[in-house]
Amino acid sequence: MKVLWVAVVVALLAGCQADMEGELGPEEPLTTQQPRGKDSQPWEQALGRFWDYLRWVQTLSDQVQEELLNTQVIQELTALMEETMKEVKAYKEELEGQLGPMAQETQARVSKELQAAQARLGSDMEDLRNRLAQYRSEVQAMLGQSTEELRARMASHLRKLPKRLLRDADDLKKRLAVYQAGASEGAERSLSAIRERFGPLVEQGQSRAATLSTLAGQPLLERAEAWRQKLHGRLEEVGVRAQDRLDKIRQQLEEVHAKVEEQGNQMRLQAEAFQARLRSWFEPLVEDMQRQWAGLVEKVQLALRPSPTSPPSENH
């Protein structure tokens, strides 16, 4: 019975091939490697193990029919997905701890963006797992349905998956760009607030120095000038520290943006390669079934063809 289900899947994939060629690009081998060096984060290593398992599934040959129809693949992907999301959560908490000295508004915004990125990654991985489970369920139920209906539904699923990954990646890039601009504006506002706060003190010190100089003479004026210069130096030091903090924040944002963009591109390319690999697995079976079907139709037509009858003889 499993062999018959696989044969029906092959026929549907063959019918969907023409529709998918218009949506997907040329086939690309799934060779992208996740970062595994000492500098990579634990959540990146967990995500790499997730993709390693997907690559292992794609290397199956003779056992691929049975593996696609049982629940072992779904269970393994679920375990790897939970491990990855656990590492992502730990990394997010670590980043939130490092952002303690930042303003409360900026810290809340960073936490919100990190949660959005975490949710997006989890949603994409969950969608991949559910897609495999859905294919398995539809294969088990397709014997009582219309072939054209299943072919159209499967073609729609295979077209929407790359588009969805691209849309998610673009949306995440836009969110990070907006956050980066907002963080820069917030840091600039903080510097402006510092200037506004210490500016009146400097002016007040200058005014007091001028007043004291008129009352106490030149020595007191020199002391006031020294005090003013000292206060001005402290103000400049505070400004430099704030600027350094802003530069560090911008650098961290650029690193996060680059990592998210790289992960989005990798997920899109690997999803497309995985779908193309599925088609390549079943192409020999499709051709063999088409030849067998053509031979069967020809035999049936020959069997049902009426034999010619001899015409009646004429009596002269």
Swiss-Prot record:
Task: Name the GO terms of the biological process aspect.
Answer: acylglycerol homeostasis; cholesterol efflux; cholesterol metabolic process; chylomicron remnant clearance; high-density lipoprotein particle assembly; intermediate-density lipoprotein particle clearance; lipoprotein biosynthetic process; melanosome organization
Q: SUPFAM superfamilies from the entry?
A: Apolipoprotein A-I
Annotated positions of the Phosphoserine modification: 146
Q: Has the keyword Transport been applied to this entry?
A: yes
- Signal sequence, renumbered to the chain: 1-18
Q: Which residues are glycosylated?
A: 32, 211, 309-310
Arranged from A to Z, the UniProt key words for this protein are: Chylomicron, Endosome, Extracellular matrix, Glycoprotein, HDL, Heparin-binding, Lipid transport, Lipid-binding, Oxidation, Phosphoprotein, Repeat, Secreted, Signal, Transport, VLDL
Residue span of region Homooligomerization: 265-316
Fetch the Pfam families from UniProt.
Apolipoprotein
One Gene Ontology term of the molecular function aspect: low-density lipoprotein particle receptor binding
Q: What is the recorded post-translational modification?
A: APOE exists as multiple glycosylated and sialylated glycoforms within cells and in plasma. The extent of glycosylation and sialylation are tissue and context specific. Glycated in plasma VLDL.
Q: Where is this region: LDL and other lipoprotein receptors binding?
A: 157-167
The UniProt annotation places heparin binding at 161-164, 228-235
Q: How does it assemble?
A: Homotetramer. May interact with ABCA1; functionally associated with ABCA1 in the biogenesis of HDLs. May interact with APP/A4 amyloid-beta peptide; the interaction is extremely stable in vitro but its physiological significance is unclear. May interact with MAPT. May interact with MAP2. In the cerebrospinal fluid, interacts with secreted SORL1. Interacts with PMEL; this allows the loading of PMEL luminal fragment on ILVs to induce fibril nucleation.
Q: What name does this protein carry? A: Apolipoprotein E
